[in-house]
Amino acid sequence: PNLPNYLGIPP
């Protein structure tokens, strides 16, 4: 599953 990104930037 995808983890939420705290930076708000896609991996």
From Swiss-Prot:
Its main location: secreted. It comes from the Eukaryota. Keywords: Hypotensive agent, Secreted. It is found in: Secreted. Expressed by the venom gland. Belongs to the bradykinin-potentiating peptide family. Bradykinin-potentiating peptide that highly increases hypotensive effect of bradykinin (BK), and decrease effects of angiotensin-1, probably by inhibiting the activity of the angiotensin-converting enzyme (ACE). On the guinea pig ileum, increases BK-induced contractions and decreases angiotensin-1-induced contractions. In vivo, when tested on hypertensive rats, increases hypotensive response to BK, and decreases the vasopressor effect of angiotensin-1. In all the activities tested, its effects are similar or higher to those of BPP-9a, and the duration of its effects is longer. This is Bradykinin-potentiating peptide Cdc. It comes from Crotalus durissus cascavella (Northeastern Brazilian rattlesnake).
